[in-house]
């Protein structure tokens, strides 16, 4: 979609509340695919597994089928509790910081949790033309999380004999053969959000070039 006039803070906050609500709904069912309707038809959604393995979904269909489909299948009972949200209405962005918890209790009665700070960075746009004309949608999303901590928590659940078959199946799915997984050189969209990568929001000029 074309770039649209800026959104008001009230509009972003209203949209954000619907986003938090659909998050809770899909966590309850274990099927995240309905969240796809919050994304623009041409949205991009990505994150990094390692320096040379990245995930990227381009378009609403890939987001539905891959990002919140294949990548989330088997995580029944997991929930992503937003701890803090920062909204920049001038740029049409929000950053949400979340804790990733499993819904599975350890021997002490504490819930297994992926430690470290996780979050999602969103860009919003009002759509022009098409079926979504006039609606606010997510134009791009980029996530980050602590991958070593993720692996540690998954293995702790397995070693305790508490991993359901659905989680074990999900853990068996990985690597570059999985749809949406790319080497860095092959990513179909930029690691940084497209408008940021294009330099549209520079807040500090580059440091002097290294000479050594």
Label each PLM-derived region with a short phrase.
Residues 2-11, 72-212:
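A beta-strand edge to alpha-helix "cap/lid" segment located at domain peripheries
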Residues 32-97:
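A solvent-exposed, acidic/Ser-Thr-rich amphipathic alpha-helical stretch
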Residues 3-42, 73:
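Short acidic-aromatic low-complexity motifs
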Residues 19-21, 64, 123:
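Short, well-ordered amphipathic alpha-helices
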Residues 18, 38, 66-70, 157, ...:
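Residues that form generic nucleotide/phosphate-binding pockets
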């Amino acid at each position: 979609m074309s770039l649209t006039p800026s959104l008001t803070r009230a509009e972003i906050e209203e949209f954000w509340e619907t986003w938090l609500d659909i998050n809770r709904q899909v966590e309850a069912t274990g099927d995240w695919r309905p969240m796809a309707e919050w994304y623009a038809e041409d949205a991009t959604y990505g994150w990094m597994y390692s320096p040379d393995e990245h995930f990227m979904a381009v378009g609403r269909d890939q987001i539905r089928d891959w990002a919140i489909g294949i990548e989330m299948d088997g995580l029944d009972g997991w929930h992503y509790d937003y701890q803090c949200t920062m909204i920049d209405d001038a740029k049409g962005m929000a950053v949400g910081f979340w804790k990733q918890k499993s819904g599975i209790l350890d021997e002490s009665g504490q819930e297994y949790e992926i430690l470290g700070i996780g979050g999602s960075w969103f860009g919003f746009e009002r759509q022009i033309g098409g079926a979504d004309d006039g609606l606010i949608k997510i134009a791009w999303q980029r996530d980050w999380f602590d991958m070593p901590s993720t692996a540690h928590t998954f293995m702790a659940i397995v070693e305790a004999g508490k991993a359901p078959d659905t989680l074990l199946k999900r853990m068996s799915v990985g690597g570059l053969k999985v749809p949406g997984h790319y080497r860095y050189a092959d990513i179909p969209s930029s690691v940084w959000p497209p408008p940021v990568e294009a330099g549209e929001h520079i807040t500090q000029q580059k440091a002097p070039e290294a000479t050594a």
